[in-house]
């Protein structure tokens, strides 16, 4: 069985990213089962760069859309180009391993696989902290990491290495335009749970650097994008936690205003909370 990998590149040349370099290190047996689609959101078009051989296929797509330059358009484009049953989402700063891909491919090819499982993921670490997958029914997600196993509720995580059944994504209408970049991953997990499907966490650890862990490293624009997306997500999909989120933001505003945390852009948080949303959220999508 082959799988399609949607690798989303940004500022760095795709051949020099952590994820692409890790793919190049795979054995020929693994490479020959991978259809790689590199979707480049960066400022430089590398269409003229010679593509390495060894993969079942390797396609480079430069994003010429000047408005939408995020993960959603990358995933949606990869979905339409893929002829495989499964699509892996991959950030450019996640390091894949031979062990993980071998385990994943074995699971996907198993004849006794639970057909209700529509997503697989690894345990993702940033340093010593497991950042994905985690519980979803709390704002303190990192305090409740998920172990290997099959889940049908209370689970969320990042999109990198999340491998999705193509038919499931098509059945729910594709990747939501509500979240062109941030919180699309949380939306995906929420849709799996809402549609009573399952996620399997494989017993394998991978490394990924999560930028949101260090707020001081974020630009003003990036900070606003992350927190406005979080606010919209909880308002539309987790209303039971929305009141807690507002309290959390108020505390962050006070902390930022008093300059106890230079990473908090408190004016941006106020803007997020006061912004009047004129468009109704898409809501949860049920299977046909």
What is the role of each PLM region?
Residues 12-27:
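Short, well-formed alpha-helical segments that are part of the catalytic scaffolds
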Residues 22, 39-49, 94:
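A conserved acidic beta->alpha catalytic loop
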Residues 65-82:
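Glycine-rich, basic loop-to-helix element that forms the pyrophosphate-binding segment
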Residues 87:
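Short aromatic/hydrophobic "clamp" motif used to bind/position activated sugar donors
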Residues 120-131:
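Short beta-strand-to-loop element that shapes/binds the nucleotide-sugar donor at the catalytic cleft/hinge
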Residues 135-155:
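Short, flexible, basic/aromatic active-site loop/helix in glycosyltransferases
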Residues 156-157, 161-162, 168, 172-173, ...:
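A short, conserved alpha-helix in the catalytic core of glycosyltransferases
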Residues 220-230, 235, 239-288:
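Non-catalytic, C-terminal membrane-associated alpha-helical segments of glycosyltransferases
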């Amino acid at each position: 069985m082959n799988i399609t990998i949607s690798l989303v590149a940004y500022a760095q040349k795709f051949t020099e990213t952590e994820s692409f370099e890790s793919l190049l290190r795979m054995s020929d047996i693994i490479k020959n089962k991978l259809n790689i689609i590199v979707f480049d959101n960066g400022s430089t078009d590398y269409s003229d760069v010679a593509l390495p051989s060894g993969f079942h296929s390797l396609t480079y797509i430069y994003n010429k859309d000047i408005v939408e330059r995020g993960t959603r358009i990358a995933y949606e484009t990869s979905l339409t180009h893929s002829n495989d049953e499964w699509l892996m989402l991959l950030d450019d700063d996640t390091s894949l391993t031979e062990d993980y891909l071998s385990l994943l491919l074995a699971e996907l090819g198993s004849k006794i696989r639970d057909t209700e499982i529509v997503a697989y993921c690894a345990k993702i670490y940033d340093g010593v902290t497991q950042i994905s997958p985690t519980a979803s029914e709390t704002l303190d997600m990192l305090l409740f990491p998920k172990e290997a196993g099959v889940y049908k509720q209370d689970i969320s995580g990042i999109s990198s290495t999340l491998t999705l059944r193509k038919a499931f994504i098509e059945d729910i209408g594709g990747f939501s335009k509500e979240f062109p970049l941030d919180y699309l991953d949380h939306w995906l997990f929420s849709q799996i749970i809402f549609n009573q499907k399952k996620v399997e966490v494989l017993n394998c650890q991978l490394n990924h650097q999560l930028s949101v862990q260090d707020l001081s490293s974020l630009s003003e624009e990036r900070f606003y994008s992350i927190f406005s997306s979080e606010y919209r997500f909880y308002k539309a999909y987790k209303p039971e936690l929305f009141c807690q989120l507002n309290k959390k933001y108020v505390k962050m505003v006070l902390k930022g205003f008093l300059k106890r945390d230079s990473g908090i852009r408190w004016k941006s948080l106020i803007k997020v909370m006061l912004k009047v949303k004129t468009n109704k959220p898409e809501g949860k999508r049920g299977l046909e």
